[in-house]
Design a protein with these regions (language model features):
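Basic amphipathic alpha-helical segments that dock to polyanions
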Residues: 66, 77-88
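N-terminal leader segment of winged-helix/HTH proteins
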Residues: 1-38
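Short amphipathic alpha-helical elements of helix-turn-helix/winged-helix folds
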Residues: 50-54
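Amphipathic alpha-helical dimerization/coiled-coil segments
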Residues: 115-152
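Short coil turns linking two alpha-helices in DNA-binding domains
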Residues: 72-73
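Short acidic, hydrophobic short linear motifs in intrinsically disordered regions
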Residues: 57-68
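Short, cationic-aromatic polyanion-contact patches
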Residues: 40-43, 95-119
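A short, conserved structural fragment
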Residues: 86-96
Length: 152
């Protein structure tokens, strides 16, 4: 248990270091309007993560879904989505049948910005270190959770 605690401390440190080094993405990938929009506020930055998660899981998202997972207020989420929509980073899907349910998905510029972000992560040695520590921690916790054969 002590080893996993020490490893967890190292993981927390590495993750904090990685999270504070987002400048790597900014430096390695030229200026882009999408990145600027989503990095201008904490709300927009966090919502982008949820938008992309829903996009890769099911192809689209609604404002209600973003409100539920983000715990931001509906007006805040709605404002951010509509601003991204006006700037052309999101598009509204048509043909859902229910006028109350509005589905959105990222446009190609936003998807390209996300791919650039992911490429920057993979090029960042700190990200690789954090990922390896996380994998080691998960394996150790799985082993610790398994009942010992000697307890019979």
């Amino acid at each position: 248990m002590r080893e996993s605690g020490t490893l967890f401390q190292r993981f927390c440190f590495a993750q904090a270091s990685f999270e504070s080094s987002r400048h790597v993405y900014r430096r390695e990938h030229g200026p882009g309007q999408v990145r600027r929009f989503f990095n201008t506020s904490f709300t927009a930055f966090e919502l982008r993560r949820y938008m992309m998660n829903f996009y890769f899981i099911k192809g689209s998202f609604t404002i209600t879904e973003l409100v539920e997972v983000s715990e931001f207020s509906r007006p805040t989420v709605t404002s951010t989505v509509h601003e991204a929509l006006e700037l052309g980073y999101l598009e509204e899907l048509s043909g859902t049948g229910d006028r109350r349910r509005r589905d959105f998905r990222p446009t190609e510029p936003m998807l390209e910005a996300w791919r650039n972000y992911c490429n920057a992560l993979l090029a960042n040695p700190e990200f690789s270190r954090v990922l390896k520590l996380a994998q080691a921690l998960m394996s150790m916790r799985e082993l610790e959770a398994q009942p010992s054969g000697n307890d019979v």
